[in-house]
Amino acid sequence: MANFVLPPIHDNSDGSWGPSTSTLPAQFKDIPYAPFSKSDKITRIADWHDPQAEAAAGTRTARTVQSGGRRTAYGAAEGTVFGFVHDEDEKSFSLVDSGVRVGARGKAPIRGRSVRGVASARGARGRGGQRGGFSTRGGRGGARGGYGDWNKPQRTRDSSVTIGPEWEVLEEIDFNRLSKLSLSVEDPEDLASYGTVQAYDKTFDRINTRNEKPLEIVNRVRYNPSTSDDPIISQYAEKKEAQIFATDSILAVLMCAGRSVNSWDIIIEHRNGQVFFDKRESGPLDYITVNENAADPPVDSDDVSNINSAGSLSLEATYISHNFSSQVSANSKSKAYTPNPNPFYSPEVESEPPASTLYKYRKFDLSIDEEEQFSVILRTEADAYLGKKEVLVTVKALNEYDPRVQGGSGKPLDWRKNLDTQKGAILASEMKNNSAKFARWAIQSILAGVEQMKMGYISRANPRDAQRHTIVGVQSFKPLDFARQMNVSLANGWGIVRTIADLVLKQPEGKFVLVKDPNNPLVRLYKVPDDTFEAGAEEEEEEQDEE
């Protein structure tokens, strides 16, 4: 039987770690230390079986084949640890990984063209944001911008209002909480109607791409005063007719808050046990957004001549909507319907006639139980009547500013060429890019109790000219069906209104501001001083008096 003799153990005389270099065996001299891998099994003397390497043998990538299956430990590979380059200066040498990195052959370079046609990496669209996920067109390595913009910096938007240092945050509600609110409301009570409304010209329904009609500039005055500036609402408030007072445009923004991307603000006043929802003059609620929910929405620009900036497009959309709603009823030969005079129009002051608008004041019951008395009075609007005076319609306008860049992540469709044959695809694209705007229009029409929504497709006569436009089509919708198609929940909107009103009523009387965060899906309720926003209004009044 063979005997096993233990080799001698040489202790280090100076007490340091490891054997002394003087006692190192001759066969191990001049061999540098090689690092080992963390996955090495050091509990056995020898183990030639590596199940991980065998499992990965059939699924090796080009990079593992190139490196010979070498495992990396502590940032260095075992097979390449000696692959250093001998330099003239021995003191400056270092161990480097000499493995050649295999690039993705055939991958298209990311250039400026990725801005158009390739969706930006925005959080709302997920990684890449491109329709269909990671596109691998062109075979191997042909990723055409699918995730090339993953590290693209996200856009930082500005708040619609400057948050003052004296503003106190009372509540912060994210959209996830808002989406869970619900309150069923019965049919409203019609209180009164004011203004003059004219008949809708049915010839506009026959407009198509082969029978276009230019958009005319109609000199009509359209009023949209805030809640507190409405004399009719002031009368109802004095009589304690309701607990909440607002307009349909203000309440629609609040009820569709979960779809908002841009920042907005609503002024809320609590006085005499009542809540008033107001808007700032010339604030974001007075203008129509364009492609707010698109993957690559328009951006603000300091260049005043840029007609495709977010601000310029919003102003253009508001201008188009005003003229289109006036044009469809301006040449009507039917008799105008005036239940009561327009409360905002004064012939002594205005030289132009008022636009066709019927202001309907309606009362909605927001009570939770039978014993509670909690209601809201709204001022709603209708733009024309259809055939009979009782059949009211609202008129809205969609604007096409540049078909080459307006198509979003999909293929752009020129309205003048494709509206008649692909109206469904164009409408679906507009619903996707303008989800917040469409939802607000649907809510406003439902609150007003109109029978139809008339939506006009307005295109620029020349993509480089924002002054001349052409009507290329008109489409009709029933508000309730349109809301279902947009997945708009009226019960959820009423739940949001009741929740915000309850939060304000729990606070002492004063002024509050509800602000949608510009970069996060949430709203904040601020307690602000009573003189907030009044200094600017007084300055504007002084300037008007001087003029």
Swiss-Prot record:
Keyword Cytoplasm tagged: yes
Keywords linked to the UniProt accession: Cytoplasm, Initiation factor, Protein biosynthesis, RNA-binding
Annotated GO CC locations: cytosol; eukaryotic 43S preinitiation complex; eukaryotic 48S preinitiation complex; eukaryotic translation initiation factor 3 complex; eukaryotic translation initiation factor 3 complex, eIF3e; eukaryotic translation initiation factor 3 complex, eIF3m
Residues passing through the membrane, by range: none
Example GO molecular function: mRNA cap binding
Compositionally skewed regions (Gly residues) per UniProt: 126-148
GO biological process assignments: cap-dependent translational initiation; formation of cytoplasmic translation initiation complex; translational initiation
Domain of life: Eukaryota
Disordered: annotated segments: 1-22, 114-159
Pfam families, alphabetized: eIF-3_zeta
Region (RNA gate): 284-298
Classification via HAMAP family: eIF3d
Sequence similarity: Belongs to the eIF-3 subunit D family.
This protein's domain notes: The RNA gate region regulates mRNA cap recognition to prevent promiscuous mRNA-binding before assembly of eif3d into the full eukaryotic translation initiation factor 3 (eIF-3) complex.
Subunit structure: Component of the eukaryotic translation initiation factor 3 (eIF-3) complex.
Functional summary from the UniProt entry: mRNA cap-binding component of the eukaryotic translation initiation factor 3 (eIF-3) complex, which is involved in protein synthesis of a specialized repertoire of mRNAs and, together with other initiation factors, stimulates binding of mRNA and methionyl-tRNAi to the 40S ribosome. The eIF-3 complex specifically targets and initiates translation of a subset of mRNAs involved in cell proliferation. In the eIF-3 complex, eif3d specifically recognizes and binds the 7-methylguanosine cap of a subset of mRNAs.
PANTHER family: EUKARYOTIC TRANSLATION INITIATION FACTOR 3 SUBUNIT 7, EUKARYOTIC TRANSLATION INITIATION FACTOR 3 SUBUNIT D
Protein name (record): Eukaryotic translation initiation factor 3 subunit D
Species: Cryptococcus neoformans var. neoformans serotype D (strain JEC21 / ATCC MYA-565) (Filobasidiella neoformans)
Lineage of the species this protein comes from: Eukaryota, Fungi, Dikarya, Basidiomycota, Agaricomycotina
